[in-house]
A protein has these predicted regions:
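Compact, glycine-rich, soluble single-domain proteins
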Residues: 76-88
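Hydrophobic "anchor" residues
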Residues: 70-71, 153
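Short beta-strand scaffold segments in enzyme catalytic cores
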Residues: 59-65
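C-terminal binding/interaction regions
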Residues: 28-32, 36-47, 104-173
Length: 173
């Protein structure tokens, strides 16, 4: 009886997962045009300017490209007790998901100390928690992460490169 219930659960879980809205579409990689990349980076810098970072002075901005073309900005928001601090990437994802959007193609991320001029400093890769949030909603084979210093100086990675052997929803089935 237990084995039969487990089998039924597995069949149902596989059906639900394979029929999730946009699941099959996530397998298709979208080629990002240069102007789209530059716009994402520009919007990430706009978001970075809104960061609330009174403690670290390290401002991060993100611009998340949804499957339909809409862009969601996010900035990091610090808190005096540190634990409730939220990263820019998660802010962008949570804004989109709270509006019912769960399919994404790319994200641009910029970050640096507030006093460092644009184009100087270093690239700002996402933290482990943000990579895991990306893995929840994005196909690691196709989702593109743009790490930028400026609109013309950037690197593009696939999620699978920044989160190899990532744990995702299909691992719970």
């Amino acid at each position: 009886m237990v084995q039969k219930c487990a089998s039924l659960f597995l069949v149902r879980a596989l059906w639900v997962h394979s029929n999730r809205k946009g699941y099959r579409d996530r397998m298709e990689e979208k080629k990002l045009e240069k102007n789209v990349i530059e716009d994402l980076i520009h919007q990430a810098f706009e978001a970075q300017a809104k960061a609330y970072v009174p403690y670290s002075q390290f401002a991060v901005g993100a611009a998340l490209l949804a499957r339909g073309g809409r862009i969601y900005q996010g900035c990091n928001i610090e808190n005096a007790s540190y634990t409730p601090t939220n990263c820019a990437e998660r802010t962008a994802f949570f804004k989109a998901v709270s509006e019912g959007i769960t399919e994404f193609d790319a994200i641009a991320i910029v970050g640096n100390k507030k006093f460092v001029p644009k184009g100087e400093g270093d690239y700002c890769p996402p933290c482990g928690v943000c990579r895991q949030v990306m893995r929840e909603f994005c196909n690691p084979e196709t989702f593109q992460i743009i790490l930028a210093k400026s609109e013309t100086e950037y690197h593009i990675y696939k999620l699978k490169e920044l989160l190899p052997l990532g744990f995702g929803p299909e691992d719970l089935i």
